[in-house]
């Protein structure tokens, strides 16, 4: 594998955590767009998302969607083999963030408080493996590879990683120590948007940005990298819009109507209001999970993002709804409070 990486100009792994958030999801997305089948799948997915945005499904589901997770820990040095407690801390954060139960949601300026969404999704470590055997929902693989890239090597045992579990039954999360873009830039994680190959479906996160304890390091030690990347896995774009065909950054869109137009990603912890694209007086919604701010400053999804996620759950991720319905035949379904339609 070393020769392959060096041919791209990446000579050695760095143990430094990036000081600013960088995500490789769009790099993976643009690579997959070279495939005609992926383009067709994405067109169908976006057409459904547009219908939902236009009111095709005005009222969201009441039942909680519960998604089984398998965490593949791929480690080289012993300290990279993160603890069960660190993994559980990440699951706990996801269940707060996707249910609007995070205490720091109070940071949202009052002008946007009515937009904060409960996405109605909960996550749990899988209790059965693909063969029906009991499992902790965690796999552990020691590797000789010292770093991985957005080319998905971590997702295959043949290249030093671990093979995915069936993507229609589990959310696969790979955790590794060092992760780089194709040009050698250190990144915190990346996700594959719905519509791509099943064998690479899921998210990848470095251990320094995973969970809230153990190897997690500030400013990415609040578990929000996984929240951000799973947002992509559920078909959310970056809040500033990612389309490269527009020279004017203010012409890009995240395909969500209630997120203000903004020019570029925000980093660190901006002061409110932070104005761009003539979006004053309130400015950028930089506290949104789909921006690039530090963990402690991203605290919300919007109702429009929830609608887009619902389209994803009814479309390319619908297998998880079927599993919820099967489970709930045996027990009373969990419910959530829904906002009144406006």
Curated annotation (Swiss-Prot):
Optimum pH is 7.5. The active site is at 229 (proton acceptor). Ca(2+) 1 binds at residues 240, 243, 249, 262-263. One of its GO terms (biological process) is proteolysis. Residues 1-20, 323-342 are annotated as: Disordered. Inhibited by EDTA, excess zinc, and also significantly by batimastat in vitro. Is not inhibited by other metalloprotease inhibitors like phosphoramidon, captopril and galardine or those targeting other classes of proteases. Its EC number is 3.4.24.-. Residues 323-342 form a propeptide. It comes from the Archaea. Disulfide bonds join 250-277, 269-297. Its cofactor is Ca(2+); Zn(2+). Binds 2 calcium ions per subunit. Binds 1 zinc ion per subunit. Zn(2+) binds at residues 228, 232, 238. GO terms for molecular function: metal ion binding; metallopeptidase activity. Transmembrane segments: none annotated. Consists of two subdomains separated by an active site cleft containing the catalytic zinc ion. Belongs to the peptidase M43B family. Metalloprotease which in vitro specifically cleaves IGFBP-2 to -6, insulin, and extracellular matrix proteins but not IGFBP-1 or IGF2. Shows a preference for substrates with an arginine in the P1' position, the first position downstream of the scissile bond. This is Ulilysin.
């Amino acid at each position: 594998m070393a020769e392959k990486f060096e041919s791209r100009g990446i000579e050695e792994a760095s143990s430094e955590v990036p000081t600013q958030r960088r995500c490789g999801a769009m790099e993976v997305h643009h690579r997959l767009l070279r495939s005609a089948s992926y383009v067709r799948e994405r067109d169908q997915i976006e057409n459904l998302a547009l219908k939902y945005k236009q009111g095709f499904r005005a009222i969201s589901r009441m039942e909680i969607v519960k998604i089984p997770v398998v965490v593949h820990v791929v480690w080289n040095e012993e300290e990279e083999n993160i603890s069960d407690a660190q993994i559980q801390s990440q699951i706990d954060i996801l269940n707060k963030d996707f249910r609007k139960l995070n205490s720091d949601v109070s940071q949202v300026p009052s002008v946007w408080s009515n937009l904060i969404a409960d996405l109605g999704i909960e996550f749990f470590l899988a209790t059965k493996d693909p063969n029906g055997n009991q499992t902790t929902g965690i796999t552990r693989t020691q590797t000789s590879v010292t770093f991985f890239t957005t080319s998905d090597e971590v997702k295959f045992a043949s290249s030093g990683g671990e093979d995915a579990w069936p993507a229609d039954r589990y959310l696969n999360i790979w955790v590794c120590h060092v992760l780089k873009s194709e040009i050698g830039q250190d990144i915190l994680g990346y996700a594959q948007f719905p519509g791509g190959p099943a064998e690479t479906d899921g998210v990848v996160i470095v251990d320094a940005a995973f969970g809230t304890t153990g190897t997690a390091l500030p400013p990415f030690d609040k578990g929000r990298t996984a929240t951000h990347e799973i947002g992509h896995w559920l078909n959310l774009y970056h809040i500033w819009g990612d389309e490269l065909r527009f020279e004017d950054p203010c012409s890009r869109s995240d395909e969500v109507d209630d997120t203000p137009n903004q020019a570029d990603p925000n980093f660190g912890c901006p002061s409110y209001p932070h104005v761009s694209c003539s979006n004053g007086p309130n400015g950028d919604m930089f506290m949104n999970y789909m921006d690039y701010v530090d963990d402690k400053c991203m605290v919300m999804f919007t109702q429009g993002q929830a609608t887009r996620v619902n389209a994803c759950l009814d479309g390319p991720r619908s297998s998880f709804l079927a599993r919820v319905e099967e489970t709930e035949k045996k027990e009373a379904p969990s419910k959530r409070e829904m906002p009144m339609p406006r």
